[in-house]
Amino acid sequence: MKNKIKYILAGCCLMTTFSCSDFLERYPLDKAVNDTYWKTEAQLRAALYPCYEGLQYDLIINLGEACAETVVWGDPTSGLSKVSGGTSSAQDNFPFYNYWRDIYGHIFDCNNFLDNYNAADVPQETKDVYAAEVKVIRALQYFWLTSVWGDVPLIDKVISSEEAYGPRNPKEEVVDWMIEDLKWAAEKLSPEIQTGQDVGRIDRWGALALMARIALQNQRYELAEKVSKYILDNSPYDLYDYEKVYHLEGNSENDPDNKESIIYSLYVKDIR
């Protein structure tokens, strides 16, 4: 009888050990995990949103028109005011530190998507459309980087923190890489302006327009002219009524006939 009790107790201990092990070895429940996440198109679409967040980054404004001599800043001691006035120094140009860090954060989101999207049980053609959108967004991030810093580290996959401090790649190499990515994306994306729930998503012309802009800024004039003319002759885009550009009625969500915005961040009134 005593032996039976010992066996029962030993069995209970083993069961407890296994059940505790199974209970403790769980994937995080408060965030997506690559090993279990990439299954459906709905998950692909959800993973696309962090990538599009990169279009809302203020670099396109603050290091563009906001730093031009036509803009007067209210606070002359602010970092961007000093950049605009030509008085910024290595000690106080914190906006540039933030931009470098944040842009590579957006690039990480894009790389994470591109490293994992093929695992989804979705038709390849559909997956490629999502990947093409992400490649355009990633190219835009590198366009900003090379426009400000020239040579930059070219990171096209998720890397470890130890690998994050590698050497810079020559600007020309990064430009060549961006153009090749955009060529691939243009082949996969729809030639139609996106509408309904897809309004604001990047289409073929967005990829080509960014390619033309990159080519122009990097003295690839023949390519810039060729791509720009192709867009002018074949795309559904056109100039918008100038008066409406600065009113809410000109927002692409409010006026589907606004065919001027090619790549843009859509803000919905009362939401974002």
Model-identified regions with their sequence ranges:
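Bacterial Sec-dependent N-terminal signal peptides
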Residues: 1-29
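Membrane-proximal, proline-rich intrinsically disordered regions
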Residues: 20-63
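Short, well-structured active-site flanking segments
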Residues: 27, 146-157, 221-228
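Short linear capping/connector segments at secondary-structure termini
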Residues: 29-33, 87-91, 156-163
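Conserved, well-structured interaction surfaces
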Residues: 41-57, 78-149, 165, 169-173, ...
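TPR/Sel1-like alpha-solenoid repeat signature
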Residues: 135, 208-215, 227
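Polar, glycine-rich mid-to-C-terminal structural blocks
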Residues: 216-220, 225-272
